[in-house]
Amino acid sequence: VDFITTHQYAGDPISEMCNQSEEDHNQTTEEIQQEYQVDMAQLFAGLKPEDGLLPMFRRVMPENTETADLNRDLLRDAALQVRQQANGLPVYYTEWNACATFGAPGNDTRKIAAYDVRAALCAEDALEGSSVWCFSDIFEELHPFPEEFHGGFGMMSQHGIPKPVYHALRLLNQAGDERLELPGALDGEISTAAFCDAAHTQLTVMTTKQNLHHFAELQTPATPVELEVTLDAAPKSVEICRIDEEHGNPLKCWQQMGEPEDLTPAQVQQITAESAVTYEKLPFTYENGAAHVTFTLGTNDIAFVRFVK
C-alpha cells in the first residue's frame, strides 16, 4: 500500500465519522438498514405530480446540514484521525464537501463556500491533497434537472454559472503562494487566514463567519470586523472582495429573474455578469506601523482583503 484515500461529507446521513459511539461502529449492515427504513407512503404524502421531481428527491434524501446542528470541525477532526490510522502513509481526501446529498438547497449558496474554504485550510496539514466534489452540476450519477439551481453538487451550475464556492476557492487559490502562520486564527467566530505572494508585494487576508448550525435557517446580525495588519510602510492601496447576499450570489439573481427553466444563453450571461465578484477599494488608516480596516461579515459571508505594498 502506497497511500490512503477516503471520502467524507459533514452531512453524511449514515457514516457520521466523528460523531459515532463504539456501539455505532459495531452495527451490522442489517441494523443500519433497519435504522434508516422509512414509510414511503408517509414520505410522499402531500406531493402532487405537478410539484416535479426535485421536491420528491429532497424528501427521499434529506440533508443533515439543512436540519441539524453539526460540528464545523468534522473534516479536520476526521482527517487527523485518518492520518493517525494511516501509520505514516500519505492521506488523500479524493472526495469531500459539506452536503452529502444531491439536491440540498445549501449546495447553491455561500454556506457551502464558507464551509469548504475554512475546512480546506483547517485540514491542510493533515492531508497530502484533497478534492472537493465536484466541479459541475453535470455528472454521471443523475440526469439534468430543469431548474438551473437545484442543489447540485457542482461548483458551477449545469450551464456553467459559477456558484459562491467556485468564487471562494478561486480567490483562495489567487490569495498568494505562501500561507502565514496564525495559530488559532481559524477557531473563532470569525475565521482568518493570511497569504503573501512570492515577491512579497501584496498580503491577502481571508475572513469568514462560517457556521454549520441549522444550516438553512441560521441568520444572525452582521458582525463588525476590525482588521489590523503590521506593515513596514503604508500600503499603496487596500481592496476587498466579498461573497455575501449581494456579491457572488447567482441563486438570488436567478430567483429575481423568476426562476426560469432551461435558461437561454442571454440569461446565462446576465446571471453570470450580475453575480461576478471583483476587488473594490477599501478605506484604511496607517499608524504606528499598522494598517487598519473595518468591514462587516454576516453568517457564512466571506471577505478577501488585499493589502498592496
Locations of the language-model features?
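Short aromatic-enriched loop/helix-cap "lid" or pocket-rim segments at secondary-structure transitions
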Residues: S15-N19, A104-G106, L142-P146, L251-W254
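Aromatic/acidic polysaccharide-binding cleft in carbohydrate-active enzymes
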Residues: E95-H214
